[in-house]
Design a protein with these regions (language model features):
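Chalcogenol-based redox active-site neighborhoods
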Residues: 27-30, 54-59, 82-88, 123
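Thiol-based oxidoreductase modules, predominantly thioredoxin-like and allied folds used
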Residues: 38-74
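A short, hydrophobic beta-strand/beta-hairpin element that forms part of a small beta-sheet core
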Residues: 48, 79-82, 88-106
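Short active-site neighborhood of thiol/selenol oxidoreductases, capturing the structured segment around
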Residues: 8-26, 48
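Solvent-exposed loop/turn segments at secondary-structure junctions
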Residues: 19-24, 32, 53-58, 100-101
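A short beta-strand-turn-helix
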Residues: 1-13, 42
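Thiol-/selenol-based redox modules, centered on thioredoxin-like
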Residues: 102-142
Length: 142
């Protein structure tokens, strides 16, 4: 996904920012992303991209080049700072629309039940017509 001259493919993206040393990241990957209902919703609405912010690869996003400069002040890949609204919190899930615009960035572990609702909220474009609180209240009454 983060390669040079990559054309948008008109599919929404979920960027899962995680590191090898993050236990919570591994648990979320093992429990949340492997949940059958979550997996079904993801494949229907999104392309899932795993992103380790400690990579040394040169990456490209929105026609810009990003590196991991390994400085004391910026110990992670520059791209994680460009994508995240929440700073360096792991795990973190970035939701993007079809034009690769960041719609939301949600940090920390999300269990399958919560994540299913979030995936529906963004995957089905509900966020464009309702706020999160209204959407959740409607889900609770079903």
């Amino acid at each position: 996904f983060f390669i040079k001259d990559k054309k948008p493919d008109q599919k929404k993206k979920i960027i899962f920012i995680n590191t090898e040393w993050c236990n919570t990241c591994r648990v979320m990957y093992r429990t949340t992303f492997s949940d059958t209902a979550v997996s079904s919703l993801l494949s229907k609405h999104f392309e899932l991209v795993n992103f380790n912010p400690e990579t040394n690869d040169k990456l490209y996003f929105q026609d810009k080049e990003f590196d991991n400069i390994h400085s004391k002040e910026l110990p992670f890949h520059q791209l994680v700072y460009a994508l995240s609204r929440n700073g360096l919190l792991f795990p973190q899930v970035i939701f993007m629309d079809e034009k690769n615009t960041v719609v939301d960035a949600i940090p920390f572990y999300l269990n399958p039940n919560v994540f299913k609702n979030i995936v529906r909220f963004y995957g089905e474009d509900i966020y464009k017509t309702k706020n999160w609180e209204t959407f959740i209240k409607e889900q609770e009454t079903k």
